[in-house]
Each structure stands twice: as structure tokens, then as C-alpha cells.
Amino acid sequence: MNIKKTINNILKVGWSLLLGGAILYWMYRGFDFQQVKDVLLHKMNWTWMLLSFPFGILAQTFRGWRWKQTLDPIGEHPRSSVSVNSIFMSYALSLLVPRIGEFARCGVLKRWDGISFPKSLGTVVTERIIDSLLVLLIAGCVFLLQIPVFLNFFDKTGTSMESILHQFTATGYIVTTICGIAILILLHFLLKKLSIYNKVKATLQGLWQGVASLKGVRNVPLFIGFTLGIWLCYFLHYFLTFQCFEATSHLSVMCGLVTFIIGSIAVVVPTPNGAGPWHFAVKTMLILYGISSNDALFFVLIVHSIQTLLVILLGIYAWISLSFTDKKMRKI
């Protein structure tokens, strides 16, 4: 059984790496990577990139504080520092194995603060539901406001959805189909995991307590503030990078929101930090807003790479910090 599970895990990781790598290869085939060095050293405004870093750190910090708040009503009280470091670790570990971070952060709380694993996992489910609903709400509002932009684009270029589909290359159809299949596979595994948890009474109770914990949140305005703060910081972490490049510095906040939302949806596809699907989705939307294909390729490659490096550094910091953190008595 363990061997079968190990093989399945290896296949999942291999599949995610293959998918992300295939999309990146298709996007950057024939791309002159020698120009990236020139852009990084001479054409990129590093001041704006550095200014975006605090917002990336704050987004994860707010997530850690919010998580602690959802655990308090169910009798679990992790330390704020451990909660935040668990978030830093979870994002870094998800670069190695997609989605593993959600389980890893629960493991960190159990190991250092004796927090019940099933209960903490239940609150993770709660958080995901809330974040998904918020993203969908923002997406709906943004796209309704941007309908004139899309119509104007089609009018100026003399195109329609029908003509776009006709111009869609065979490779484009393949990539889109692969992304769709990947989402279905992810849903399959999530449902399969859920069915396994349902067979374990203690875990089911923990999950339910985690979901129900939202009702007992003592400071609802603070919880809402953390939630909005998380996504505002994520957006600023992304949007400020527009100012790093001359080609994107003129783009509006609304354009930033559209590309940000599309990118956030694209990372649902299980690849390390959304590598591949995120590049494809954001690059496509930037082209829609008038950015050349080459400039869009530079933007998504550099921004994603640097922000991924930040995630790695935060993970290393968390690992070092936890190494010097005393462990509380564990709960069974």
C-alpha cells in the first residue's frame, strides 16, 4: 500500500512538472534568453520590484494571523510567530510538491504548538472557501466593468470571438485542453481525498469544527480586514511590478486587476507556483491590453521568477526561525 501511495505521489509530482514545463517550453521556444540579462541589468526599474516585496510578505503574514484567529474559537491557540512561519513554509514547500503546503502548515502547528491536525485542516478548508468566493466576486465585478474594453478591442481589430477561435492554433487548443484536464484531475483527487477523510470519524469531526469555527470568530471586522488585506497585498505585490518595465508602466489599475484575477484562477492548475498556466494566462491578457508578445513574455518570466525566489527566501527564513523556536507539548 505504501509503495502504491509513493508511486502515485511521484506520478502527481511528475505530472505537475511535466505540465508546467511543457507550457513554458511552448511559450518560450525560440525565445532569446540572452536578452533577459540585459533587461535585468539595464532596462528594469528595480526600485519598484523592491517596493513590491513588503506586500508579498504582508500577504502571507496576514494569512498567518487570520489562520490563528479561525483556530481560537475551537480551542486551539497557536503562537502568532509559528502560525506565520507555517504559512511561509507552506508556500515554499508547494514549489516542490503542488498543494502539499496546505498539509505541511497543519503539520508545523502540530509539531511546534501541539495543535490538532484535523481541526487545523478544517480551518484551511474554511479559508479556501472564503478566498475562492472573494476572488469570484472580484472577478465578476471587474469583468463587468471591463466589458467595454473587450468590445473596443474587438471593434478596433475587426475581430470577433468566432474569428479568434478560427485563429487559435492547434498548439493553443492543446494547451487549453491540457489545463482543463489538469483542473478535472485536481478535482478528482480532492474528491477522493474527501471520501477518505469521511471514513475517519475523528478527522471528519475536526474538519467540521474547522469550518464551523468561523461562526465563533470573536472579532469579525478584524477577520474581514485580514481577508481583504491578504488580497490587497497580493494585488499590490503584483501590480507594482508593472512599473518595473517601460512597456507595462502605463497600464491602469483595472488592467492590473483583470490580469491579476486571471492569473489567480490559472494557478488552480497544479504546477509549482502556477508556473506555466500563470505565464500563459497573464501573457495572453497583457497582449489583449496592447502589450507586444515579446514584452509580455519578458514580464511574466521575470516577475514570476523573482516572486518565486522571494517565496523560497521566506521559506528558508521560516525554517531557520522554527529551528530556534521551542516546541510546546503535543496533543494526540
Question: Which residues fall in each region the model found?
Answer:
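Transmembrane alpha-helix interface/packing and boundary motifs in multi-pass membrane proteins
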Residues: 89-98, 258-279
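Predominantly cytoplasmic-facing regulatory/coupling regions of multi-pass membrane proteins
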Residues: 1-88, 145, 150-267, 306-332
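Interfacial segments of multi-pass membrane proteins
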Residues: 109-116, 210, 280-298
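Membrane-interface alpha-helices at helix entry/exit sites of multi-pass transporters
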Residues: 80-83, 100-102, 115-129, 292-302
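Membrane-embedded alpha-helical segments of transport systems
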Residues: 92-97, 121-144, 298-313
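Helix-loop junctions at the membrane interface of multi-pass solute transporters
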Residues: 69-74, 95, 106-113, 285-288
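Hydrophobic, aromatic-rich membrane-embedded alpha-helical segments
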Residues: 84-111
